[in-house]
């Protein structure tokens, strides 16, 4: 808390964006409403649907910082760019597609502020929060990948593939992201779980998943890549 009794603005929110012209401004506005947010780092990853032009023409709050990739390089590359520019003590990942509610950050940041966690995952599968009905095979695939994660790394996560990951900045400074694509999700999890010094918490979150018709980008191929990534970092020195 600051001298006025309000939560301090300590959170940097990193938003990787690719072809989200319909939702990106709404998501940025939702994030900026949070009193804990110090900055919003937006990385347009070579969008071709007009997203970049919308971002460039919009007069944003001074807390918003924009970065642009000239071509589509992938979510991992976008996060690498974003993480390299954050200034907040705590960093969170936010997709631009409205599947996740930024209000959840108020709960997720508490274990970090209380000094009991270094990393907090927002779990869509631990129960207790509203959920839009999932695509069945996505649910099965995520459940399988989470089981493999728990087995390989001796942890008890319930939602390895969640977008909502929050870190003390020092944690990110200790991780070198190698993946350019969606494999960044299992890579981050693998490297976090391998480092037994980092305390990981899970917090239940709400989730309003999109259909493919609404713009969902994850397919079964990403699941195979995620499995390979988990196995690779289990044995990699």
Regions found by a protein language model. Give the residues of each.
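Hydrophobic helical membrane-anchoring modules
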Residues: 1-9, 152-154, 177-237
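Conserved donor nucleotide-binding strand/loop of the catalytic core
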Residues: 38-41, 52-85
């Amino acid at each position: 808390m600051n001298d006025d009794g309000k939560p301090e603005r300590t959170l940097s929110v990193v938003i990787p964006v690719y072809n989200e012209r319909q939702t990106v401004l709404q998501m940025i506005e939702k994030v900026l409403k949070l009193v804990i947010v110090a900055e919003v780092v937006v990385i347009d990853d070579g969008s071709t649907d007009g997203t970049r032009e919308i971002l460039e023409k919009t007069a944003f709050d001074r807390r918003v910082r924009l970065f642009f990739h000239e071509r589509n390089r992938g979510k991992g590359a976008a996060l690498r760019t974003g993480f390299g520019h954050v200034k907040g003590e705590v960093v969170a990942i936010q997709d631009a597609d409205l599947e996740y509610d930024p209000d959840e950050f108020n709960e997720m940041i508490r274990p970090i502020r209380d000094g009991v966690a270094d990393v907090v995952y927002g779990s869509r599968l631990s129960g207790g929060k509203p959920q839009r009905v999932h695509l069945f095979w996505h649910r099965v695939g995520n459940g399988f990948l989470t089981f493999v994660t728990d087995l390989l790394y001796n942890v008890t996560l319930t939602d390895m593939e969640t977008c909502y990951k929050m870190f003390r900045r020092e944690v990110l400074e200790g991780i070198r992201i190698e993946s350019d694509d969606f494999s960044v999700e299992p890579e981050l999890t693998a490297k976090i779980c391998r480092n037994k010094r980092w305390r990981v918490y899970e917090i239940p979150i709400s989730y309003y998943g999109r259909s493919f018709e609404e713009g969902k980008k994850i397919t079964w191929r990403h699941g195979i890549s995620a499995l390979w990534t988990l196995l690779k970092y289990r044995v990699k020195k």
